[in-house]
Amino acid sequence: MIQMQTNLDVADNSGARRVMCIKVLGGSKRKYASVGDIIVVSIKEAIPRGRVKKGDVMKAVVVRTAKDIRRADGSVIRFDNNAAVLIDNKKEPIGSRIFGPVPRELRAKNHMKIISLAPEVL
């Protein structure tokens, strides 16, 4: 459950390290984002010579949440941290690598490029 003002780790090599959610996309009164949802983020911490810099406003896909994800078979999956992958306007990842595991739920939300770059799909 990601809402406005939530800080997230960045799970790609775009150059950003920490981002803050400033808007959850999808409806005027939408409060929370879960795995696979697109949010608008502000870059709070970035590495030198990265593709993005501190203060940039971008879109991102939530790939990990500390809140439980319930599956149709009754199982539950949760992660240690909240993480996102920065995307461009064509919904393609900005980075060329993804770090850490991502859940299968991204496939249902048509983020196939992120699934293919990820080292592990849970």
Curated annotation (Swiss-Prot):
PROSITE patterns: RIBOSOMAL_L14. One of its GO terms (biological process) is translation. Disulfide bonds: none annotated. Transmembrane segments: none annotated. NCBIfam families: rplN_bact. Binds to 23S rRNA. Forms part of two intersubunit bridges in the 70S ribosome. Belongs to the universal ribosomal protein uL14 family. This is Large ribosomal subunit protein uL14.
